[in-house]
Every structure is written in structure tokens, then in C-alpha cells.
Regions:
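Hydrophobic core segments of alpha-helical transmembrane domains in multi-pass membrane transport
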Residues: 16-28, 40-49, 76-83, 116-119, ...
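Short helix-coil transition sites and intra-membrane helix breaks within transmembrane domains
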Residues: 30-35, 69-72, 83-93, 119-133, ...
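Hydrophobic transmembrane alpha-helices that form the pore/transport pathway of multi-pass ion
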Residues: 100-188, 361-399
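Membrane-interfacial loop-to-helix junctions in multi-pass transporters
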Residues: 11-15, 54, 66-72, 99-114, ...
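C-terminal transmembrane helix pair
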Residues: 103-106, 193, 347-452
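Juxtamembrane helix-boundary/capping and inter-helix hinge elements in multi-pass membrane proteins
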Residues: 50, 87-92, 102-106, 139-150, ...
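Long, contiguous bundles of hydrophobic transmembrane helices that form the permeation core
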Residues: 2-11, 187-301, 419
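Core transmembrane alpha-helical segments of multi-pass membrane transporters/permeases
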Residues: 37-40, 44, 60-93, 269-331
């Protein structure tokens, strides 16, 4: 259990949270108040409605803002710089054209989904998004199709990789808490991840992409429409994209390789996500900037323009994080878990429901994973279950922690801001995609548990 900062009365907290979320939706959708202001107002309403003392509420809001931005500011900023160079230089255009040539327009989204799945096992969701989303925009611009046709497979791949397949932080975290061997987790997680990508990424993107087209983001800069011969080479662009991913992966696996104590600190430093992105930006500036004929002043203008939307993106993410922390510090997660423990439902289903309810109420996937895994690990008899059954439980927990992303989740606002979608579009596309990932994880977990 995560001890709350303020132990709110359960009934009062549930009412305050429900009214606060309704208030948030009304402020944004009906009264057209900016999401940043609406999020903070709703967070304050929930805290005061739950009876949280004003000094504690102020401290929670400040902590929520700081902890939400911690580690993500540099990722978003550096990712924007990287994406700006990749886009204006024609690098994204080159990759988009190559994917279309190799897979055809109808299968380029599948290629992006597989790319996201692989990348999602090695990096956090936010880092993968900011590195790879320019490729989806490039494909959408080239084919004139809805951006969702390409972005949804990419996002689904990243989400499923993070949730189900080691060495991702999400799958390793819960597997360790339930004492699941990572080899077994990989054997169970890979097919679950592939099925989740199929349903949430490939099939859902075709459905929603034919119905919603948010258009290309307004900050997409004008790309020099050149002949393919004048574009940077596919190999060059691919290598630059892979550099931060390989560095992050090397940092992750170095912890499991004996006899490299001398170089491990170097690998860990270079594999720190923001360091890896700095290296990628510098490589992009030279190979996609200077080598493509851009001078220093032109590169500066490209970088300046690519950073313009990041302030609003970060503020919206912060607002979502503040709501999450207010709910968490009031003890929302500790209300949900014990109630379901006594329900008598199958353990895999209980695991999913605990994680899903915490995810829906608190917003943060990792918090939902941690709290649900802690509750399940403490339940009688869980330690005696078979390794495969426990791996199925990991899939159910992480599926529940992925599903039902909405206005209290910073990821909801990150995706909505990057794609410049309003809240209705984000709910219809992103929230549904995340929920399909989660339900697929549950169904697979239940089926596997029957044979474990």
C-alpha cells in the first residue's frame, strides 16, 4: 500500500472525485476554458471537496507539478528539436517514402506498429513518442491520410511493449514484485503484446482513421519537397534514429552482464534518455542539417520553431499530473484495492480490476501497476501459484494499468497536444486504443491462467 498524505473519508473522496471529473469535462467541453486552467481548478475542487487541509493541498499541487515534469521536460524539449530537424531536412519524408516503397501504403502502419513494439520494450513511452512520431506525421503528409492511421499503430506498439514485454520498466517492475522469472515473462508477454498490437494498433487504426482526421499539427514545418536523390539516405536517417534507442538499450542490459564493471557507468550515462537524445540531436544537426546544406542561422531557426509548442504541452501534462497526485495523496488507490480483494472473483480478473480502477481514478499507469501488484502479492496463496499463472497475472495487471486513460492521465494530454486533437477526439482515439490494449491483456491473461 502507498500511504496517503491525507486519509480522506472514502465516501467523501469518491463523491469529490466524481464531481471533480465532471466539472473538468464541463469546463473544457462546454465552457471552452483552456485545459491547463480547467485541470488545476478541478484538482483544487477535488482536494477541497475531499476535506484536504489547504496547506496540504497546496503542497500536493506543487509536488504534483514538480514530480510530473521531473524527467519529462528535457525529453519533450529534446524530442521536439530532434523531430524538427528530422522533419525539415526531409529525413521523415525519406523514411516515410521508404516504408511506403517496401511495405506499400496499406502496410506502412504495420511497420510503424512493429517499430513501436520493439522500441517500447527499451524506452519509456514518452521518449519513444517524441523520437518516432515525426515518422508517422511524415507518412500522413505523404499519403494524405488521417494522422491516426499511422499514429495509432505506433502508440499501440509503444504501449504494448512497455506493458507486457521485458526489459521494459513496466513489465519488469510488476514481474519482480510477483517474483516472475523474466524468461517466462518474455515467453508469455511477446504473444500478448503482438495480439494487443494487432487489435489496438492495426485494426483500430483502420476503423478510427477512416472516421476522424485531426489533420497535421500546425507546428509541422514546411519541408523542402525534393527529389529522392536530394533527400538524406534512409540508412543515415535510420542510424540516427537508432542511436538513442541503442544507447538506452545498452544501458538497460548492462546491469545483467557480468564482468563489465569498468564500462558499465559509461553505458549507464550514455543510455540516460536525455543524454541519448542530446547525442541524437547533435548527430541530426550535422548529418541532416549541415551536410544537407543548412547553415548555422537556418538550423537555429528550425530549432527555435520546433520548440514553440512545447510550453503548452508541458503545462497540460502538468495539469493532468496535479489531479493524479491530489487523488493519490487523498488515498484513492487504498480505497479501491481492499474492496476488490474480498470480492471472490478469479485472481486474474481481480488483478485487472484493481489496476484498472486505480488507473481510472489516479491516472498514472506506473502507480496503478505498483499498487495493484503490491495488493495482489500480499493476498494469501498468490506466492504458491505457478510461474505461468503469475505471468498471466502480470499481463492482467499491466493491461488494467494501461486501459481507461482519460483526463487525469498526463499521457492523454501529451498525445492530444502533440496531435492537436480536442478532448473528444482524444477520448475516441487514444482512450479507446489504450482500453483495447488493456482488455486484450486481460483476455490473454485469463486464457493463459486456465492452462497454467
Amino acid at each position: 500500500m502507498i500511504e496517503p498524505v491525507f486519509a480522506a473519508d472514502p465516501t467523501r473522496l469518491l463523491i469529490a472525485a466524481a464531481v471533480g471529473i465532471i466539472l473538468l469535462l464541463l469546463l473544457i467541453i462546454k465552457f471552452k476554458i483552456h485545459p491547463v486552467l480547467s485541470l488545476v481548478i478541478s484538482a483544487l475542487f477535488i482536494g477541497l471537496g475531499a476535506g484536504m487541509p489547504v496547506p496540504t493541498l497546496v503542497s500536493t499541487v506543487e509536488k504534483g507539478a514538480g514530480d510530473t515534469l521531473q524527467g519529462i521536460v528535457l525529453l519533450i524539449g529534446l524530442g521536439s528539436l530532434f523531430g524538427g530537424i528530422l522533419e525539415v531536412s526531409g529525413g521523415a519524408q525519406c523514411v516515410a517514402q521508404t516504408l511506403i516503397n517496401k511495405f506499400g501504403e496499406s502496410k506502412a502502419g504495420i511497420a510503424l506498429g512493429i517499430t513501436g513494439l520493439v522500441v517500447g520494450t527499451t524506452v519509456f513511452f514518452e521518449a519513444g513518442v517524441v523520437i518516432l512520431i515525426p515518422l508517422a506525421f511524415g507518412l500522413a503528409k505523404k499519403t494524405k491520410k488521417s494522422t491516426l492511421y499511422y499514429v495509432i499503430p505506433l502508440l499501440a506498439g509503444l504501449a504494448t511493449g512497455f506493458a507486457f514485454i521485458p526489459p521494459s520498466a513496466g513489465s519488469v517492475l510488476v514481474a519482480n514484485m510477483l517474483h516472475v522469472d523474466l524468461g517466462i515473462m518474455i515467453a508469455v508477454g511477446v504473444p500478448v503484446g503482438i495480439l494487443s498490437l494487432l487489435f489496438a494498433g492495426i485494426l483500430w487504426s483502420k476503423f478510427i482513421g477512416s472516421r476522424i482526421n485531426p489533420g497535421l499539427p500546425s507546428n509541422i514545418q514546411e519541408v523542402r519537397e525534393e527529389e529522392e536523390a536530394n533527400l538524406p539516405s534512409f540508412a543515415t536517417v535510420l542510424c540516427i534514429i537508432l542511436v538513442p534507442l541503442i544507447l538506452i538499450l545498452c544501458s538497460t542490459i548492462s546491469a545483467y552482464i557480468p564482468g563489465i564493471d569498468a564500462v558499465r557507468p559509461v553505458l549507464e550515462f550514455l543510455g540516460t534518455p536525455f543524454v541519448a537524445l542530446i547525442i541524437a540531436v547533435l548527430l541530426a544537426m550535422y548529418f541532416l542539417g549541415t551536410r544537407q546544406g543548412y547553415d548555422g542561422e537556418q538550423l537555429k531557426k528550425i530549432l527555435d520553431r520546433s520548440l514553440r509548442p512545447t510550453g503548452q504541452i508541458l503545462l497540460v501534462i502538468t495539469g493532468g499530473g496535479i489531479i493524479r497526485w491530489v487523488l493519490q495523496d487523498c488515498g484513492m488507490g487504498n480505497i479501491i484495492g481492499p474492496a476488490l480483494e474480498k470480492s471472490g472473483l478469479p485472481l486474474v480478473l481481480v488483478a485487472f480490476l484493481i489496476a484498472a480502477l486505480i488507473r481510472a481514478s489516479v491516472g498514472a499507469a506506473v502507480v496503478a501497476m505498483t499498487m495493484a501488484a503490491g495488493i495482489m502479492a500480499a493476498m494469501p496463496g498468490v506466492a504458491e501459484l505457478s510461474p505461468v499463472y503469475l505471468a498471466a497475472m502480470v499481463c492482467a495487471i499491466n493491461g488494467g494499468a494501461t486501459a481507461f486513460s482519460h483526463v487525469n492521465d498526463s499521457g492523454f494530454w501529451l498525445v492530444g497536444s502533440l496531435l492537436e486533437m480536442d478532448e473528444k477526439m482524444t477520448l475516441k482515439s487514444w482512450t479507446m486504443m489504450e482500453t483495447i490494449v488493456g482488455i486484450t491483456g486481460l483476455v490473454c491473461g485469463v486464457v493463459i491462467s486456465l492452462f497454467a
